[in-house]
Amino acid sequence: MGFTILGTGSALPERSVSNDELSEFLDTSDEWIFTRTGIKSRHVCTTESLDDLAVAASERALQVSGIDASQLDLIVCSTTTGDHLVPAEACAVAERLGATCPAFDVSAACAGFVFALDVAEGYIARGRAERVLVVAAEQMTRALDWTDRATCVLFGDGAGAAVIEAGGDSPLAVELSTAPDVETLRVPGLVGTSPFKASADSASVLSMNGRRVFKFGVNAICDTVHKLAIDAGISVEDIDHFVFHQANERILGQAVKRLGVPDERVVRTLRETGNISSACIPLALDRLANAGALHTGDTIALVGFGAGLDIGGYLLRWK
């Protein structure tokens, strides 16, 4: 049994920070950042919590879907930057929405929304759920070294969500994989003390090997799109829309060039949002839907890639 996307939603913090503002305390400039990343600004939480963003995106998706939270059978949330390690971010969303269904998180870094969508589809396929809220919310700016211009200029905060319902022919194809590598892109875990183990001070901030990420990202997008098309029995040219993880414009540009697809079929939100990890894909999907660009029968390729190194691809049919 497949599913249909009933509605989408997204949310961004009110505060938008431009490249020029970053140049006030970093050795950088708008030109330096934009030419290397394609980013002009990013949204940053000031008064908002991650719970606020996740709930706002979820409420919008429910509103568009015409579904009340009490009708949900499951909530799956993708995040690596939750307001709390426990309970799950999904539980906070459920509480504020007034839902009483099972709720839990999935952690697969920037590929997380696709993995969460696959978990939701599995519940539907087994008859365990009929309506599922899938949400991705990230506050990446809390995990950055704001003195490191190579990383802090890339990321922002935000959330995206989708409500799916049993019935329909999505997914047409699924590709999930992991190329195990825990050093290329990582954020250290808890820094605590224990009388039984010597502890060294360590800042819990993101570190990244940019060159490795570039090569990995381009290959992940291209290989996954080709696999999705083959599995669905169509050609890459038959895919109407491409929603890729918004990591860096150079990655997107190189991937689009290699795939040979029209640039107008590729959704881009990077310029004004930066990289918001797993929230990139659902936010971009919501932008696409709000623009009136999606029509019944359209095919949409979602491809996320990130730390782990995890890769997630989904080929959907819009209805």
Regions picked out by a protein language model, each given a short descriptive name:
Residues 16-17, 86-88, 144-148, 311-315:
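Short acidic, glycine/serine/threonine-rich loops at helix termini
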Residues 57-73, 223-240, 288-293:
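Phosphate/pyrophosphate-binding loops at sites that engage ATP/ADP/AMP, CoA/4′-phosphopantetheine
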Residues 26-32, 84-98, 134-140, 192-199, ...:
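Acidic-glycine-rich active-site phosphate/pyrophosphate-binding loop
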Residues 71-84:
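Short beta-strand-loop/turn "lid" adjacent to the catalytic site in phosphate-handling enzymes
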Residues 1-47, 148-215, 219, 223, ...:
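Condensing-enzyme catalytic core mediating Claisen C-C bond formation in acyl metabolism
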Residues 6-9, 78, 107, 132-138, ...:
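Short beta-strand segments
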Residues 125-159:
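Flexible, glycine-rich active-site loops centered on histidine and acidic residues
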Residues 55-58, 62, 81-82, 92-95, ...:
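Claisen-condensing/thiolase-fold acyl-transfer catalytic domains that form or cleave C-C bonds
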